[in-house]
Amino acid sequence: WKQNQTIKSSVQDSQKIISLNCGIGLLELNLDQEIVAIDEKRYQIDDAKLNAKYLKKENVTFIAGDLDSKIVTYAKKKVYDTLIIQNERYGLSDTIKDTIKIAKFKTIIYACQSHSTLAKDLADLEKNYKLERIIGLDTSCHNSYLTTIVKLVRK
């Protein structure tokens, strides 16, 4: 809940959002902007679509598929001002990094549980983006994970 509220407050000025690793869409269904939410796990996208239907949320499009190919497809179709990345441990692929450079998102919100992965990806992203805010959240009191949420803005 804390993570979703923190991200929600960071995208208030956004109009169109792409969200990667959306899971069952808990964050995306709490936002009012136009959103394309992508996850590789079809069963989670199926649940997200059911939740959207039940909640009558028509602003979110949930897509199941390979993150690399889907972000390229959607970034070419329309201009999005914000990218949300919810990453547990794995870093961003070269395809996603290249798409970020080409799409020129105004804002990137990156939530990650692996500090080494986050540091590596930030080193690449900081070539075109400025670190505006970093927040650490204890999102699970029963383990030692700390979720770090970073807000980057285009230079």
What are these regions (language model features)?
Residues 1-155:
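Rossmann-like S-adenosyl-L-methionine
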